[in-house]
């Protein structure tokens, strides 16, 4: 390791004085003009991680659903999964090291992680469409090359596409071909094969309007359209030709504001969906004949997919386990429907994709979706082998069901949540089951809910257990919440500290919107009084 060369190169990627950043679930995110040093250093770290794992490592330059002026970076581990927690700590330490301490920090990481510095390293890089992304990705490459790493720059990619590339490169092509053409070919072939089983339906049923958040999803969906059959008509809106990234559009905007994005023309009962800025989240929605907006979030997506998978498994007579993984934010109606109607076991984890992904790996077929629309399905190696074997052996209805399951395996991006992949799965299932978006929405009715934030002096005064559904401290707060919940029908409430700011997040649901609002207000007040609230006291009616 040529520490002098690293120090020299680092001087042209100087760290702003006093800037401290934390590598979180989404990697690093902040204003784009504060990230040059972080990008250079993540190039260095990716090389060390590659040497340590003897694998290709990915670096994605994106800030997902954040405003266009922000940017960020995250590393992708060998099987396309998120960076290991111990290396998140290394990333934070390296990003925050002062200029004169950088060389020492690199040596410390190398020693602590037992990195063989003579091992070859290979890093792949992708970026979104933000104006700052190209220059920042060049800083990553500078970091990779100064440490002697080899690299391939894929240029513009969705985040899930980079995860796919990393997985392909580290599995000897077993997962697929590590090119953009390979990605489109794998997904489109599976979609075409799966859709062949659908009885013909009118064009109206197969038209989908997609809000691309003025992001990378638009470019990649345009490319993919050439691979898709005529039967699926996809109309793109907010495609980046005008309008800013994530500005009044995209999955996060639609979910948080509970209204359609700007820039999309919606007629009654038309099927619409939104991607987020880097195309790893998707949510569906429509307006009814009375003009009312209906949101179909990750909970309902998970319900549609898991019920379809269970039906196919019943058809082939296999006792493979299906599990659905949710967070405490999942609507209570979805949990009840899955457990009581579909008889599918549901498990709750802490908030954050890595927790859901990890839990989903415990099942033969693990379905996970956050309410925000980020999710996928994981198939165990044994389940995948069994399904592929049955697809060859079985005939008639059972054989057809096994082949459909095999196509579903290939259609999901098992490395991470992928808006394009999830969209194709959903469209295939709706066509196969002959469901309209209204019928899908009617599977169950969401309980009214309300989310609020309470400013506190120190968010660390609150600690939780039971997948963030119970407060452990301060003492007495959980008892107060329990007493408030008892006042309302079909109600529940929980509070959890924010991961990024000194606020406590409050979630409440009940049998009516009025009751959900009242419960959320009363719980907020309890938090304010017992957990060191600052500023204005919570008010009824917000």
Curated annotation (Swiss-Prot):
Keywords: Acetylation, Carbohydrate metabolism, Isomerase, Magnesium, Metal-binding, Phosphoprotein. The modification N-acetylmethionine is found at residue 1. Substrate binds at residues 370-372, 496-500, 505. The modification Phosphothreonine is found at residue 62. Optimum pH is 7-7.5. One of its GO terms (biological process) is UDP-N-acetylglucosamine biosynthetic process. Binds 1 Mg(2+) ion per subunit. Pfam families: AMG1_II, AMG1_III, PGM_PMM_I, PGM_PMM_IV. Its EC number is 5.4.2.3. It comes from the Eukaryota. The modification Phosphoserine is found at residue 64. Inhibited by Mn(2+), Cd(2+), Zn(2+), Cu(2+) and Be(2+). SUPFAM superfamilies: Phosphoglucomutase, C-terminal domain, Phosphoglucomutase, first 3 domains. Mg(2+) binds at residues 64, 276, 278, 280. It catalyses: N-acetyl-alpha-D-glucosamine 1-phosphate = N-acetyl-D-glucosamine 6-phosphate. Pathway: Nucleotide-sugar biosynthesis; UDP-N-acetyl-alpha-D-glucosamine biosynthesis; N-acetyl-alpha-D-glucosamine 1-phosphate from alpha-D-glucosamine 6-phosphate (route I): step 2/2. Gene3D superfamilies: Alpha-D-Glucose-1,6-Bisphosphate, subunit A, domain 3, Alpha-D-phosphohexomutase, C-terminal domain. Catalyzes the conversion of GlcNAc-6-P into GlcNAc-1-P during the synthesis of uridine diphosphate/UDP-GlcNAc, a sugar nucleotide critical to multiple glycosylation pathways including protein N- and O-glycosylation. This is Phosphoacetylglucosamine mutase. The lineage of its organism: Eukaryota, Metazoa, Chordata, Craniata, Vertebrata.
